[in-house]
Amino acid sequence: MIQGISVGQQDHPAAGPAAWLAALGAAMAVAMALLMPGAAAAEGRLVAHLSSKAQADPPKGAEGLCRRYDWACARGSSARLTAEQIRMADKLNRRINASVRPVTDLAQYGREEHWALPTARGGDCEDIALLKKAELIRMGIAPDRLLLAEVLDRQRNNHAVLILRKDDGDYVLDNLTNRMLPWSQTPYTFLRMQDSSAPHRWKAVFAGGLFRG
């Protein structure tokens, strides 16, 4: 199991350069040990679906997520997505992005990280990702096609998004953009995501961004 993948601060300024470089170096060392021969070449071909490398701890603040929201860790049937459901997901992504005000966990809960649905005050990136997952499950999309993921953004801060697992690839629903993009077309370094076969577990991913050859 991989522990402590996070190397930045979620929705907060990045850690100091020395601390960040040390943490990233450790994460990359683990990643290189886990990657099979030829994985870098596969990454260069922009694999449609993100693949997991090993079991990982949940992100900071998400440890009790399944107890708070059983639907967040529910298994699904991998039922085929319809064109209408994909259109609904795109529309919902835009609507929630426009309606939820950005508020940090520190301001709401007095702690740096706490994964929860947005309140009347608003929410941060993981809160918004959770709300999108809840709404899309309610609309009939199978839970195992909706996977929470932790990434690094361009500034190397931790950030959370929702993955919509379509048949032709993994697409990202992100509170920072209204465009629903394939994961490989985002600027993000993907660190870990929910295991589609057992969403109460998290898997290391190590793809995109800093891991592109």
Identify the meaning behind each predicted range.
Residues 1-17:
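N-terminal secretory signal peptides that target proteins for export/translocation
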Residues 2-4, 39-213:
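A structural boundary/capping signal
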